[in-house]
């Protein structure tokens, strides 16, 4: 089951729990707007190349639409649609005043020079500038994009609309970015993990962790868990996997990856088959990479009691069912990885106010939002006798449905 089908399934289940009528359910499911554009740019060698870009604006009942822009060869309308819808529920779960959107361009960033990436970004912005905006749709970085990409979008957009720092988030600090944004998704994952463990009478200290993915999110998760006394016994990324039952030294591992570009040949651990990482014995498993990694083929062999979905859609519905029957506790992606969009909201607020927060304030506010959201999810679970995933979806769908009804849009 692909990401769109799984997201729709979760939404419909939440709708049934809430007793939404079919007309309202349909209006919440259909995207507000789907945009497809062709972006033709001159390459460095003088040839022309055309790339297809997408922006799906799913819902704006609770506020401006919010979501990343990814540059990846496998970007397609279904994936963008699913991720846009997921952003609607994600922003609603943590109760920030946004709806959901997502965008992307089908390209391979590593095959493009910096100047080609800049031209592509500016052309894409020219095509969609009148459909995004501070109070309309606010993009952010995603897979294959970064703060520099946002700087180009900001600059190109400002040519048409004047200086508009709040039109994108995840910007460089010098252009209005927020302190704490780089670590925000990973830090949010850790705050979410702490909230879940506390509910089970546990803490991070002394537990064993396995982390799949060691990019921005995974590396920050590892660093922050290590600081709290957690024992990270295995880590993987696209270059390989490394384990140490006594605990990996994350500072050394980060230094090794920075120097070599990979996890392999790390002296502080042993090589392991990346395919065995997800089923490695541990207390807490944190997938931080791609979707669909936990499926019906490997779910029965997963040994972790707690699974924290730092990636988007890492668990197939079939795996979800298998893991739940085994007594596994899954913290769903629409909550667990919402730290990034929450601090994006803080950045947007700072830009509108023209007043920058200290990093300590950013982190403290993030902890408040993540902790409060967890307690709201648990309350939904208790009210409807459902899983954490359905508690999160039910909470989110109910908030969006209420806003939609109050606006009179459901008819």
Swiss-Prot record:
<dbReference type="InterPro" id="IPR046346">
    <property type="entry name" value="Aminoacid_DH-like_N_sf"/>
</dbReference>
<dbReference type="InterPro" id="IPR006096">
    <property type="entry name" value="Glu/Leu/Phe/Val/Trp_DH_C"/>
</dbReference>
<feature type="active site">
    <location>
        <position position="102"/>
    </location>
</feature>
<keyword id="KW-0560">Oxidoreductase</keyword>
<dbReference type="GO" id="GO:0006520">
    <property type="term" value="P:amino acid metabolic process"/>
</dbReference>
<dbReference type="InterPro" id="IPR014362">
    <property type="entry name" value="Glu_DH"/>
</dbReference>
<dbReference type="GO" id="GO:0004354">
    <property type="term" value="F:glutamate dehydrogenase (NADP+) activity"/>
</dbReference>
<comment type="similarity">
    <text>Belongs to the Glu/Leu/Phe/Val dehydrogenases family.</text>
</comment>
<dbReference type="Pfam" id="PF00208">
    <property type="entry name" value="ELFV_dehydrog"/>
</dbReference>
<dbReference type="InterPro" id="IPR006095">
    <property type="entry name" value="Glu/Leu/Phe/Val/Trp_DH"/>
</dbReference>
<dbReference type="GO" id="GO:0004352">
    <property type="term" value="F:glutamate dehydrogenase (NAD+) activity"/>
</dbReference>
<dbReference type="InterPro" id="IPR033922">
    <property type="entry name" value="NAD_bind_Glu_DH"/>
</dbReference>
<dbReference type="InterPro" id="IPR033524">
    <property type="entry name" value="Glu/Leu/Phe/Val_DH_AS"/>
</dbReference>
<dbReference type="Pfam" id="PF02812">
    <property type="entry name" value="ELFV_dehydrog_N"/>
</dbReference>
<keyword id="KW-0520">NAD</keyword>
<protein>
    <recommendedName>
        <fullName>Glutamate dehydrogenase</fullName>
        <ecNumber>1.4.1.3</ecNumber>
    </recommendedName>
</protein>
<dbReference type="InterPro" id="IPR006097">
    <property type="entry name" value="Glu/Leu/Phe/Val/Trp_DH_dimer"/>
</dbReference>
<dbReference type="InterPro" id="IPR036291">
    <property type="entry name" value="NAD(P)-bd_dom_sf"/>
</dbReference>
